Amino acid sequence: MNHEVIVTCAVTGAGDTVGRHPAIPVTPKQIAEAAIEAARAGATVAHCHVRDPATGKPSRDVALYREVVERIRESDTDVIINLTAGMGGDLEIGKGEQPLEFGAGTDLVGPLERLRHVEELLPEICTLDCGTLNFGDGDYIYVSTPAQLRAGARRITELGVKAELEIFDTGHLWFAKQMLKEGLLEDPLFQICLGIPWGAPADTTTMKAMADNLPPGATWAGFGIGRTQMPMVAQAMLLGGNVRVGLEDNIWLDKGVPASNGSLVERAIEIIERLGGRALSPAEGRRRMNLKPR
């Protein structure tokens, strides 16, 4: 069991939640304010995507990331900044017998292009999504090939940024460990991502199986989406891991009650404390994760 817990808040994500929740952060100002709100509620880390301010759709615009990061860094919080580097892997294959006629949802770029904002802004942590995945129903695939992952891992290491390896299924963990064997990564973090169709399900058996297969001594966290978010907070802590909550993964605090990032962090910390633990401050989290000063 982990008694000193890193709490990550994923504040907006890239999902189709705008319009289903009254206050999904969309503009850089809103996203930065959400990260600051999470920090004030007790989060150790803020995990950030950006969205097109006009449409709310996910974006890779470096200028949007720059504004978010600058606003957080200029605030009175010292929350650890974790930027996604998973955008640019979206492939919507064509319908029926025309799979090569890619759909409008396709946004597919190379591994270094996915890291342009990381190269410029040098966050303390960035993500690396460790495998290809059938993402939801229909014809949408998230593409992250072994060659792309090796190139991304090398570049993240060169930049001195801590890699958070996003593990959506057991094969992703297998390949993440292979990259470690090849010396492509230095002391990465592992994030066990459960309940995203059609990766690994969010249940006790699955999280334990994946946690049991992590490299010895690895720093890891786990989360579930939707109604499994808080049960997986308890599960990850009991298994010795850290936790993640936030509007990226769950938009409800209780049935019929929209959540905020701050309220989700507070609920997670309540669970942690009731189990006899405590949330780490950003300064403590930096020491735990051996982060390089920025």
Curated annotation (Swiss-Prot):
Induction: Highly induced by carnitine via the CdhR transcriptional regulator. Not induced by glycine betaine or pyruvate. Gene3D superfamilies: Aldolase class I (3.20.20.70). GO terms for molecular function: 3-keto-5-aminohexanoate cleavage activity; metal ion binding. Disruption phenotype: Cells are incapable of growth on carnitine. It is an enzyme of class 2 (transferase). Its EC number is 2.3.1.317. GO terms for biological process: carnitine catabolic process. InterPro entries: Aldolase_TIM (IPR013785), BKACE (IPR008567). Keywords: Metal-binding, Transferase, Zinc. It catalyses: 3-dehydrocarnitine + acetyl-CoA = N,N,N-trimethylglycyl-CoA + acetoacetate. Its cofactor is Zn(2+). Zn(2+) binds at residues 47, 49, 248. Catalyzes the condensation of dehydrocarnitine and acetyl-CoA, forming acetoacetate and betainyl-CoA (N,N,N-trimethylglycyl-CoA). Is involved in a L-carnitine degradation pathway that allows P.aeruginosa to grow on L-carnitine as the sole source of carbon and nitrogen. Belongs to the BKACE family. This is 3-dehydrocarnitine:acetyl-CoA trimethylamine transferase. It comes from Pseudomonas aeruginosa (strain ATCC 15692 / DSM 22644 / CIP 104116 / JCM 14847 / LMG 12228 / 1C / PRS 101 / PAO1).
